[in-house]
Amino acid sequence: MPIPIEIKKLFSAARILGSGDDRVTLSENELFCLLAQCCSDLSIQAAVSQLPSLSVLPPSADYYRLPLAWFQTAQADCPSASALVESLAACVAHEPDFSLYFSNLAALHKRRRKYQRILSTQPRPTMNQIGPRSLLEFGGVQHELLAAWLVWRKWIFDVDNRAAQETGYLFEPVLASCLGGEAVGSRNSPVKRLNEQGQPTDEGRQIDCYDGEEQLAYEFKLRVTIAASGQGRFGEELSFPVECRAAGLTPVLVVLDPTPSPRLTELIAKFTANGGRHYVGADAWAHMDSKAGRTMAVFLERYIRPPLTEMAIHEDTGPEPIQLSWSRDEILIRGSNESIRIPRRV
């Protein structure tokens, strides 16, 4: 039976990210491991997937516990690209949402691959770039310490900016797809900003997730606190449900952290006053699981919820002391119990 064109397009899209020097291309070996991971997550047997057994077993069933190097470890019976496409088609025929599950996991994996390369290649700041900043602190400490402080904070700032960029391409689009919608940029948004007279303008508003079937406009938030944003930014958040209602859409607020705050209460009231809905904490996760359906709820619970929930635990605790060192071959970050080694390829 011929493989549907949509399956071939799905496989091709899953394989490549970006272009030029920034391109990430997944090998057959990596795609084999990712397909096997999806099948394991969804309890799809080999009789269905037609995938051979992995000759090098994963050290954990949890994707986040698997080193990126494992995906590149040669598997003795790795199928060809055409055989992998056939397996993908078989899995999609068995479970239609497998296509989205695999696509999202591949997107996550490619971004993680790309970010590791960024960490390895992000240039060390030069004194030509950062030297003038020493005027603000010069003389207060030894020159060597000040120079190190300038270098580290600039490099960390740079790699954090790159992390924000990569996450922006990943988090909201993946979350939106799990809910059966899509993230919409301001240029193509059906929600328009209102002027002072309450009339729509030509300027659109970004929507975290647009559900065209039910005409819902989602706003995702990890947490809403008094310190989360300035008054100007909060005014933007309060105007979102008003502008959604004016566009004929139902605004939906999803806040993953249940920590109460006056601003959260005010934001919920604004959504409610404009015919909107809100889901906070456990209700937010339950709503998303219900909306996602059986298969994509597994993706949410395995790949989205664990890192967000775990990191939220450390919101109000002081950061653990760490030691940073930079050698020719690596950057070493030491904590109290573990270390992070970043090979350098500059």
Give the location of each predicted region.
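Interdomain/boundary linker segments immediately adjacent to catalytic/signaling cores
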Residues: 1-178, 327-346
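Short, surface-exposed loop/turn motifs that are enriched in glycine and acidic residues
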Residues: 165, 169, 208, 223-230
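Short, well-structured alpha-helical interface segments that form or flank functional binding sites
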Residues: 166, 170, 174, 204, ...
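A short acidic/basic microdomain associated with nuclease active sites
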Residues: 176-202, 208
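Flexible internal linker/loop segments at domain or repeat junctions
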Residues: 200-201, 219, 231
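Active-site beta-strand-loop-beta-strand hairpin of nuclease catalytic cores
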Residues: 205-218
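Catalytic cores of nucleic-acid endonucleases
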Residues: 222-273
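Domain-level recognition of nuclease-like catalytic cores that cleave nucleotide substrates
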Residues: 256-346
